[in-house]
């Protein structure tokens, strides 16, 4: 699937600060990013560094008074979705060392607090069938609400309210999956079916020796998800992280299908 991606961000800064910007899609086995163009109308690039797991690129920028940037690219997504129900768990002793961190509790995904719930709610399930059932549970029981959460909202907060945005859906699913001993990580992404259009967040689970995308909101599928970066949770994979105050003035995302 060929997609056009465009993101515009405008922030003001009360005083000069550094920020990490990560809006550029990665090129990997499942997608190719063509003709990427990042225009910094204000703010300047200091250095490019790799993202987590060497996936994607982060851009250190300095913001004096204002950050004003536009990113555009065309992305060819060639990913073929696996049938989750057919995927088996990789024995934990066989997991690659880089994957082990995604079994652990993290800042926004306190998986240890979900042990009792997952053991009772999803008894008898394993592997991909377990992950699919968990994703379906989140989608069925949560209400998508852009006014409920904030940057500090955790998986336990969202689980209590049963409301949130894609970030919150992803955090809850990650916590549930990790609680049952399956590695799961946060993925920042773009997707054409997101409503309202915005930056998106989904989940990758490690099954049968590889990572597989899952979207608990149901707004995207592996065949139309544009991966940007990954991490333990949103703390590792934010589109913009500032080391100083930044005030949002304007932000927009457009993802359009060009061809299938």
Residue spans for each PLM region:
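Short low-complexity stretches enriched in small and charged residues
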Residues: 22-32, 88-91, 157-163, 167-170, ...
């Amino acid at each position: 699937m060929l997609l056009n991606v465009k993101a515009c961000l405008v922030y003001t800064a009360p005083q000069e600060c550094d920020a990490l910007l990560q809006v550029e899609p990665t090129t990997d086995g499942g997608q190719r990013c063509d003709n990427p163009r990042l225009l910094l109308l204000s703010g300047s690039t200091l250095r490019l560094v790799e993202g987590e797991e060497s996936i994607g690129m982060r851009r250190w920028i300095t913001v004096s008074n204002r950050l004003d940037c536009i990113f555009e690219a065309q992305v060819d997504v060639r990913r073929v979705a696996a049938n989750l129900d057919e995927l088996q768990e990789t024995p934990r002793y066989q997991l690659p060392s880089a994957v082990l961190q995604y079994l652990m509790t993290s800042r926004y995904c306190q998986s240890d607090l979900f042990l009792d719930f997952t053991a009772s709610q999803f008894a008898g399930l394993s592997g991909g069938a377990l992950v699919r059932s968990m994703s379906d549970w989140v989608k069925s029981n949560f209400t998508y609400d852009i006014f409920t959460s904030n940057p500090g909202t955790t998986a336990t907060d969202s689980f209590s309210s049963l409301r949130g945005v894609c970030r919150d859906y992803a955090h809850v699913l990650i916590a549930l999956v990790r609680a049952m001993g399956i590695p799961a990580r946060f993925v920042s992404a773009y997707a054409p079916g997101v409503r309202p259009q915005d930056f998106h967040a989904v989940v990758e689970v490690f099954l049968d020796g590889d990572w597989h995308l899952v979207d608990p909101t149901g707004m995207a599928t592996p065949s139309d998800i544009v991966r940007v970066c990954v991490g333990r949770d949103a703390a590792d994979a934010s589109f913009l992280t500032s080391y100083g105050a930044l005030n949002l003035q304007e932000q927009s995302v457009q993802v359009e299908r060009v061809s299938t």
